[in-house]
């Protein structure tokens, strides 16, 4: 498959059209880091449980640059489904059974069905990559995975899984071999590589599904920063088998992508031209605090309320609590939500404690930042 896009189509898809290169004549300098540092990054990642199970959750990531939610969501979903490592039963030994095309007297399921059931058993190991699980049962009973006792280093996650059904007086002895891996490994592939002669003669390979992800999907919605609504919100819905949590699965997928992208970065960030160290670069707090509130895209009502309360800089604003703001005349919940969203986009919030505020020469420092 060939994927090809030019800059004009990307600009049109994003709702913008290029009008010329403002930097070609040396009017402004673009540092290497500007290509990524100037982009909007998510101010929050919210984990919302889906129901009572901790294994299902929605992760809400916003705000993102237009188009980024689809790009990131698709990459994260594919990596989660294909590349996360987990544990699975890859083979069994059943007493008096030499191959899978066998029926066992007194056992209602044939060996093929038993292997299919066992392949769906979910296991979590701690501090090891492999383990042999043993189970001895006497009928009549239903043999379920929960009959395998948990230990400090091994937990059966789906304890109600039916393995087989025994009639009166039937003994059922089985060993299950568990190891770590990724993706799906069919039994035929396992047989082709197990030619070392060190496995038991009655070892039967099983299909092994190692992925800890049961379901993963995503959707894209619009997000906003102030009055601008051309941003993305990414909502990822993840369900795991219980060996890891949904937010851990997304974090691992992101780390895999980070590692895979590393070879594409063919420059050293330390080679950038040395930038003059300004006083503003050594301030002990966020530079956004020096911006004036009239730079924010506030509604007229919200701006007038701040002005009447003598709030000039964002640093003045964030030191107010929500209760303080709601006591301001004509300032209501709608204005509060508007300000909270704007502050969150800058990784700020109401009720912050800022030492040594305001700084000396705040007016000149604020002007330097506005000109940057």
Curated annotation (Swiss-Prot):
MF (Gene Ontology): DNA binding; DNA-directed RNA polymerase activity; protein dimerization activity
Description of how the protein assembles with itself and partners: Homodimer. The RNAP catalytic core consists of 2 alpha, 1 beta, 1 beta' and 1 omega subunit. When a sigma factor is associated with the core the holoenzyme is formed, which can initiate transcription.
InterPro entries on file: DNA-dir_RNA_pol_insert (IPR011262), DNA-dir_RNA_pol_RpoA/D/Rpb3 (IPR011263), DNA-dir_RpoA (IPR011773), RBP11-like (IPR036603), RNAP_asu_C (IPR011260), RNApol_insert_sf (IPR036643)
Keyword Transferase: yes
Highest classification ranks of the organism: Bacteria, Pseudomonadati, Pseudomonadota, Alphaproteobacteria, Rickettsiales
Function: DNA-dependent RNA polymerase catalyzes the transcription of DNA into RNA using the four ribonucleoside triphosphates as substrates.
Key words of the record: DNA-directed RNA polymerase, Nucleotidyltransferase, Transcription, Transferase
EC number(s) stated in the UniProt entry for this protein: 2.7.7.6
Protein name: DNA-directed RNA polymerase subunit alpha
Region (Alpha C-terminal domain (alpha-CTD)): 280-372
Name of one Pfam family that matches: RNA_pol_A_bac
GO CC annotations on file: cytoplasm; DNA-directed RNA polymerase complex
Catalysed reactions, as listed in the record: RNA(n) + a ribonucleoside 5'-triphosphate = RNA(n+1) + diphosphate
UniProt-listed NCBIfam families: PRK05182.1-2, PRK05182.2-5, rpoA
